[in-house]
Amino acid sequence: MESFNTFVRQYNDQHAEAIAKGELEALAESSSAFIEKASGIKSRFVMNKEGILDPQRMVPYLPERSNDEWSILCEMAVAAAREALQRAGRSAADIDGVIVACSNLQRAYPAIAVEVQAALGIQGYGYDMNVACSSATFGIQAATTAIQTGQARAILMVNPEICTGHLNFRDRDSHFIFGDACTAVIVERADLAVSKHQFDIVSTRLLTQFSNNIRNNFGFLNRADESGIGKRDKLFVQEGRKVFKDVCPMVAELIGEHLAANEIQVAEVKRFWLHQANLNMNLLITRKLLGRDAEAHEAPVILDSYANTSSAGSVIALHKHQDDLPSGAIGVLSSFGAGYSIGSVILRKH
């Protein structure tokens, strides 16, 4: 926040004459009160803070690596994967496929998933997928299908999110939104599972509906039109109020219908692990579902500490808020974001 406010003061000083003439609008400073009221975010973790905190730069500094080194996304994914493997009581030999599902990939090819596969010594196959903030739930659904069809015994689904790489730190409405994180999930045949931390996947449901209200236009064709290079739409941009108005009822409706299709009453759900983008969105979604305000334990919040970590957020919430649930307890893992994209995964504690 201090680097943003320093940038604002420098900008206003440099353009004081134009601002005085009404040719430019003065930029407004940010504040902790504004950020917490708008989002519920109080802190975050980032891969590199020095570059972000430099008012002259305000971009993380992540040096390019040689092709002989593992990429930074691979490095993150491997660290999370090893923790997930240990928690599941599995080794690389037990995994038949790798899905890297995240909101931004650092290169077109070779796939980060294939690199992760090599780094961990996993046989089989790997591929990348991007459904923005819903990448994890869509990845779980893809992994579930692979298990159900006999294509694999177990799938490693991992979400390396360096969200600060596509965040405009000079935009007051979004400079605080994202943090960096990586999560990993192992989906495997129930009859082979040995972990003490198991959940049965009862059902999955996905929905997409096209919208321009959340966009990132960065891509390989940008260089074909130099006039667009460096414009703000090449980073994360959104119409926040429109997103709030559109997405909240869509998520509540999808989860409600998904539960009903599986003959589960909303009141039977012990926990909602929702996408961690905005506290106000989650409060409204659970209020629509429950018909009342959710208790803190019913819809745990981690975005106050981690900020929006895109696809990783709901999985972090699941990881940190599951151990107290008894066997047989029902929970819903749900994500929502750009696309629009919404994923719902009904889980039962083993």
From Swiss-Prot:
Pfam families: ACP_syn_III, ACP_syn_III_C
Listed CDD domains: KAS_III (cd00830)
Keyword rRNA processing tagged: no
Top EC class, one word: transferase
Biochemical pathway: Lipid metabolism; fatty acid biosynthesis
Active-site residue list: 133
Superkingdom, natural source: Bacteria
The keyword Iron-sulfur is assigned to this record: no
GO biological process: fatty acid biosynthetic process; long-chain fatty acid catabolic process; secondary metabolite biosynthetic process
MF GO annotations: 3-oxoacyl-[acyl-carrier-protein] synthase activity; beta-ketodecanoyl-[acyl-carrier-protein] synthase activity
EC id: 2.3.1.207
Keywords from the named record: Acyltransferase, Transferase
Catalytic activity: octanoyl-CoA + malonyl-[ACP] + H(+) = 3-oxodecanoyl-[ACP] + CO2 + CoA
Protein function: Catalyzes the condensation of octanoyl-CoA, obtained from exogenously supplied fatty acids via beta-oxidation, with malonyl-[acyl-carrier protein], forming 3-oxodecanoyl-[acyl-carrier protein], an intermediate of the fatty acid elongation cycle that can then be extended to supply all of the cellular fatty acid needs. The enzyme thereby shunts fatty acid degradation intermediates from the beta-oxidation pathway into de novo fatty acid biosynthesis.
Family: Belongs to the thiolase-like superfamily. Beta-ketoacyl-ACP synthases family.
Name listed for the protein in its UniProt record: Beta-ketodecanoyl-[acyl-carrier-protein] synthase
